Amino acid sequence: NQGTSVVENLIIIPNSDEVTSINLNIDKSIYLGNALICKNTNIKYTATATYPVRVQSKEASIIIDRCTISGLLFGSGFAMPEVKDEASIGYFGMTDTNIKVENTGTNLYLVTNMNCNELRFENNIVYYSGVPEATSNVENFKVFQGPSYSVNKLTLTSNTFIDIESGYSNGKTSAIVYPSKIGDITVNKNIYYFTYREYPAFLIRVASAEKSKVTIAENNYAYLFETGLTLNVFQNKIGDTSVGFTSNDVDLYDTTDPATFNKSTGTFIPKEGYTQYGAQR
């Protein structure tokens, strides 16, 4: 519970053989001055409003590694600027982490409305733990939301998204990463999977496509469920690059086998032939 006091550096890492993980319950926003680093930490947000992290500085660093995250709220998310245009992120790295979304709603953003020099989102699982249907599903989820803000370098690799919609109501299409531009894009070995889907869905969308560059975009897999809705890696053409999923019609999981597809444990292991894609656990 930090209240409105500024924390310059918050570092949470187990440092003994006896303690292999730490439970971090956040019931008020952390006003971040410089760096947040969490490793092997079970992060649970227990407040009833706003974001867990409010960034107050330019070029702040956020590093989340081998963690679990739960309790994030719709209408907010994980990190936001305390004052618009007076905060930015130098490095945002989330790796080997599970994000469990237990409720349904619209607009859940991990990072919103800040420039980000480098965004690395790698080997993570993001999943809705319930059973999606027309009246209850996860809509407009974003790793990065900021069509007026830029990401200079994006690495989006080896992630698994389960029943997480990037689109939302009224036919509005969007993407899991949506900045104004991305200077350099690597998007590789991701799995985007639905047991139910209502809207078109994409991994990446940019507001200024001509100012973005694709370095690697390959080996991304998706499954559409039983719909004809569009699902693509890029919502719009980026430079001369228009890339779809390597496959979007192969059912990648045996959803009847709790040893390989289990929302209660966060276990998602693809069928043989596809185990090298998505998050590795």
Where are the predicted features?
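Acidic/proline-rich low-complexity IDRs
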Residues: 9, 23, 118, 153-155, ...
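Acidic, glycine- and Ser/Thr-rich low-complexity intrinsically disordered tracts
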Residues: 207-281
